[in-house]
């Protein structure tokens, strides 16, 4: 049975020596692969995994930083918009004040011009009345002198005119 046990169905026998050498060679090959190929390969794979994890962590940190930056930008934009609105409101208030001041100054200037014009009118009126009084007195003297056929002095004439003007003014 030993002779039959060493033969397989196809009639080939097992050679234990060759099998042992093949097995030892295979084990040596596995050890060499583990030492020279698997170790460096595993090291490369571990480094790659660390790099990927680091890249993921960096990406997450960058995302967090981007969110913070976006929030800061929104806050800055809001502050800027508020500041612009305040500047616009202040400008409107200042414009209203200037408008009121300009109107006030224009009214004061117009009132001053009106007062000046009224003073000028009153002054001219007084001059005109004085001129008319002088002319009336001259005419009165002329008429009176023709009527009386005599000349009266200038002082008497003025007193007479003033007397008649006062009497005319009282009526």
From Swiss-Prot:
It comes from the Bacteria. One of its GO terms (molecular function) is proton-transporting ATPase activity, rotational mechanism. The keyword Transport applies. Its main location: membrane. Keywords: ATP synthesis, Cell membrane, CF(0), Hydrogen ion transport, Ion transport, Membrane, Transmembrane, Transmembrane helix, Transport. InterPro entries: ATP_synth_B-like_membr_sf, ATP_synth_b/b'su_bac/chlpt, ATP_synth_F0_bsu_bac, ATP_synthase_B_chain. The chain crosses the membrane at residues 13-33. GO terms for cellular component: plasma membrane; proton-transporting ATP synthase complex. It is a single-pass membrane protein. It is found in: Cell membrane. PANTHER family: ATP SYNTHASE SUBUNIT B (PTHR33445:SF1), ATP SYNTHASE SUBUNIT B', CHLOROPLASTIC (PTHR33445). F(1)F(0) ATP synthase produces ATP from ADP in the presence of a proton or sodium gradient. F-type ATPases consist of two structural domains, F(1) containing the extramembraneous catalytic core and F(0) containing the membrane proton channel, linked together by a central stalk and a peripheral stalk. During catalysis, ATP synthesis in the catalytic domain of F(1) is coupled via a rotary mechanism of the central stalk subunits to proton translocation. Component of the F(0) channel, it forms part of the peripheral stalk, linking F(1) to F(0). Belongs to the ATPase B chain family. F-type ATPases have 2 components, F(1) - the catalytic core - and F(0) - the membrane proton channel. F(1) has five subunits: alpha(3), beta(3), gamma(1), delta(1), epsilon(1). F(0) has three main subunits: a(1), b(2) and c(10-14). The alpha and beta chains form an alternating ring which encloses part of the gamma chain. F(1) is attached to F(0) by a central stalk formed by the gamma and epsilon chains, while a peripheral stalk is formed by the delta and b chains. This is ATP synthase subunit b.
């Amino acid at each position: 049975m030993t002779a039959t046990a060493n033969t397989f169905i196809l009639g080939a026998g097992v050679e234990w020596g060759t099998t042992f050498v093949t097995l030892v060679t295979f084990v040596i090959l596995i050890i060499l692969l583990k030492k020279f190929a698997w170790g460096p390969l595993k090291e490369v794979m571990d480094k790659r995994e660390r790099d990927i994890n680091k890249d993921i962590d960096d990406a997450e940190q960058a995302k967090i930083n981007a969110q913070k930056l976006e929030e800061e930008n929104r806050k800055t934009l809001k502050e800027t918009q508020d500041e612009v609105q305040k500047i616009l409101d202040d400008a409107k208030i200042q414009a209203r004040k200037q408008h009121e001041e300009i109107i006030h100054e224009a009214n004061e200037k117009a009132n001053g011009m009106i007062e000046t014009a009224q003073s000028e009118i009153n002054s001219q009126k007084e001059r005109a009345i004085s001129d008319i009084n002088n002319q009336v007195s001259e005419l009165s003297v002329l008429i009176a002198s023709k009527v009386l056929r005599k000349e009266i002095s200038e002082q008497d004439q003025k007193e007479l005119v003033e007397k008649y003007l006062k009497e005319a003014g009282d009526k």
